[in-house]
């Protein structure tokens, strides 16, 4: 019998990094004198970094060049990485670790399929990295969700045909 596989998204499924994202965007926005609230942050869920930046810049008092936008996105990510380096297993969502462990004990292959370019760092910080047979992150794909590329790549690495 062929082994089954389960693919997990990262943020909002296994862990929560919402506050880290909010604080990083808020710091960057404050430095640029752009109003940014938790309500604004909700609009950024599931949106790529550059698309998120465009949403943040909707409230900016001035226009930004493409070069400036790239710098702002990089700055936000530097702040975000500083914050996720401080994550602990408290960021793991209830039942996530236990679910993955039970699946592995049952012989099911497991993978993380995340658009985040920081997925491995997050998994390492919270102590989940070793629970997965493969990890596909934003460094390995060209299209962000909702495009299925990240999930198809994870299935391919597990030698599975998606169903």
Regions found by a protein language model. Name each.
Residues 2, 82-112:
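Short, acidic loop-to-helix structural element flanking the phosphoryl-transfer center
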Residues 20, 48-51, 98, 117-121:
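Short alpha-helical
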Residues 31-34, 60-63, 127-131, 159-160:
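Short helix-capping segments at alpha-helix termini
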Residues 46-83, 94, 102:
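A metal-dependent, Asp-based hydrolase signature
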Residues 89-90, 113, 117-163:
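Substrate-recognition "cap/lid" segment bordering the active-site pocket of phosphatases
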């Amino acid at each position: 019998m062929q082994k089954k596989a389960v693919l997990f998204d990262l943020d909002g499924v296994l862990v929560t990094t919402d506050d880290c994202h909010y604080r990083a965007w808020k710091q960057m926005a404050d430095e640029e004198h752009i109003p940014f609230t938790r309500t604004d942050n909700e609009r950024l869920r599931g949106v790529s970094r550059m698309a998120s930046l465009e949403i943040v810049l909707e409230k900016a008092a001035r226009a930004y060049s493409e070069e400036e936008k790239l710098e702002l996105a990089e700055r936000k990510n530097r702040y975000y990485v500083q914050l996720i380096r401080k994550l602990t297993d408290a960021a793991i969502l209830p039942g996530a670790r236990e679910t993955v462990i039970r699946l592995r004990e049952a012989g099911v292959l497991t993978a993380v399929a995340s658009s985040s370019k920081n997925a491995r760092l997050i998994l390492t910080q919270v102590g989940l990295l070793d629970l997965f047979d493969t990890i596909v992150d934003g460094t390995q794909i060209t299209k962000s969700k909702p495009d299925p590329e990240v999930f198809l790549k994870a299935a391919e690495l597990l030698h599975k045909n998606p169903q």
